[in-house]
Amino acid sequence: MLARASYPFKLSSGQFLELGVQGYHGRFVPQTQAIPVGGGSVTPSRPDEGVVDERVAFTAVWYPQPFGVETEWNLGRGPELSDDGTRVESRSLQGGYLQFNYRQAKAGMPLFPFVRWQYYDGGRKFARNAPHSNVNEMDFGLEFARWSELELTVVYSHTFERTRTSVFPYGSAKGANRVGFQAQWNY
């Protein structure tokens, strides 16, 4: 089951504020694989019908005219590997982001510089065995949208902490930096 409700308000300044709430409830069947435990290996068990996966999130968007703020925070329960590594169970999670942006449009060249902090503490359900994941990152970026059909973005990210969930034992990256580029075609 999935539901979302949001409502935009036009403020006296002409700027728009949109508030929303969304949530879902269902079951998720995570993939599992053997992990090394004490000289042997164990494949974590999970319910055949899947693990309870439910969340509620709150959203607020103050659309940039020229300054804007966007945030979303979610709370819930989802698949996560147990502390002893023998089963995938439903455990609490939380996370979200806060983004500040600015719309600058000079000579038909719209630029959107932004700063975004993102945080997550919970199971990573799409990774094998749904291990616990911590994410705490800060992004600095610039989006260029000269044409409505094409958006180009460059982002510098600083990772305060991010759990590496691809290989057991699940370690943590701290103090990492990366640069990303994205081209998005809108049709």
Listing of model-derived features with the role each one plays in the protein:
Residues 1-22:
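Internal alpha/beta core interface subdomains
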Residues 15-187:
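Outer-membrane beta-barrel pore domains
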